[in-house]
Amino acid sequence: CVLVELVQAETGITPANKDWVIALKEKCESLCVVLIVDEIQSGFGRTGTLFAFEQYGITPDILLLGKALGGGLPLGAFVANTKMMGALTHSPVLGHITTFGGNPVCCAAGNAALQVLQQSNWIHEIAVKEQFLLEQLVHPSILNRSHKGLWMSLQFSSSVLAKKVAACCVANGIITDWFLFAEDKIRIAPPLSITMEELSEAVNKIKVSIEEAVASN
């Protein structure tokens, strides 16, 4: 099998090349290799569509979901077609792998969250909000920005400066942190429900935080 994130999260929001993804899918099909797509962080509208794979013109054999799936409660999912799931019912039966699987309260929360997402215009508004961030979230100390939908990383000259910026952001009311494999970048991932007014206020606070961090560096 091949396991991929179409948008690598912890490297600092790194989207895969569409042609490469299509070629990967074709190669997997030609070799009868299962393609597993991890959308635990990118799923449920974060990238501008319900799932990121929709923007790449492919359908994975297996889809991994979590985080936003539960609407605030712990919930994960392994999604595949009937044939694929049927292969997991014997030799051996995989029903023993979870104690709390299918928790009814978490599943109800996930279902309710999905209904709210589908009934709102949040996903349709992401392109406008993404463009606003690209136009307004600019500062000389930001060396690079990588983004996909309402999801962005800001790169600074060092991990020390990035962590100072993150700390100043938190002090100014903006929750952020750095990335597991990119400590010189900070994460911009506001809730999909954020209004343009709130987004504008957040951008201003981030700029102020950068100024404060640079001054103390």
Q: What are these model-derived regions, one by one?
A:
Residues 1-217:
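Conserved N-terminal phosphate-binding loop of PLP-dependent enzymes in the Aspartate aminotransferase
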